[in-house]
Amino acid sequence: INYDSYRKPINSYDRKNRVLGKSKDELYPYYGATGQIGFIDDFLFNGEYILLGEDAAPFLDKKAQKAYMIKGKSWVNNHAHILQSLVFPEYLTNCLNSIDYFDYVYGTTRLKLTQENMNRILVPVPSIEEQCKIAQAINNLFVLIESIKASLS
């Protein structure tokens, strides 16, 4: 389910003024194409969502994250598509991070994934049990990678 129509763009100047003098517990995460980029004094969304970069995401970098999950109250800017999954969310997020976006994005200096092109992306949908197994196996591999990285530093 796509919630892009609920996004409200806000420039950095206005966002900065809205948080001025507010305590951390009065603020909500503010997300963009590749992750949290700050805080704001209001929220547009409350739930579990998958965010997929619309522009400014590293679409052609096979190792880079293009989609990520958020939970709770938040504000998402107009540089990320906002999705709620009808399948296991971790599975869909992993699928969206493994897709070759070459045929779905356009632009020379700043690649863009339009909603129309995003809707053309086909994701295999096995049973929910299989989705859970796949997502858990991928998560276990990421934990192993982080463990190895930590032991090397």
Show which residues each predicted segment covers.
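Non-catalytic DNA-recognition/assembly elements of restriction-modification systems
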Residues: 1-32, 124-153
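Short secondary-structure boundary/capping segments
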Residues: 20, 42, 72-73
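Cytochrome P450 core scaffold surrounding the K-helix E-X-X-R motif
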Residues: 41-42, 61
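Short Gly/aromatic-enriched secondary-structure transition segments
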Residues: 45-48
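Short beta-strand/turn segments that mark the catalytic/cofactor-handling region
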Residues: 54
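Basic, amphipathic alpha-helical recognition segments used for DNA target recognition
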Residues: 57-125
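Short alpha-helical segments and helix-capping/turn motifs at coil-helix boundaries
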Residues: 34-38
